[in-house]
Amino acid sequence: MTFYTPKNLSPRQKDLLNYLGGKPYCKNIIDGENVVYRDLGVYDIEISGGHRKTQTFAIYVWCKEPLRIVERHVRLPHDHAMIKDILDDIVARYSDKEENEHE
């Protein structure tokens, strides 16, 4: 079965990316889904969902080695300020940290 993945973020995802100020956040495709993404070195942030008005956002923090989710925030409303606050907290805790510091 082939799934169609749009090449661009949805308008709501673009709004969030613009609110976050663009760089260091960017568009990426993870598991066939357009997501907002940020590389933190040993960790990655994936912001998925939010494609439609009724679809909530989810934030996942991934450890790259071994590949696993270490933190998740799900069912987040389209509240850009709240999402940015969560992301700022995540960045402060995970940016340029070694994997074992969060165990």
Language-model regions, residue ranges each:
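Short beta-strand micro-motifs enriched in acidic
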Residues: S48-R52
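Short, well-ordered strand-loop elements centered on a beta-strand within folded domains, enriched
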Residues: K53-K64
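Negatively charged, low-complexity tracts enriched in Asp/Glu with abundant Ser/Thr
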Residues: M1-V42, W62-A81, D85, A92-E103
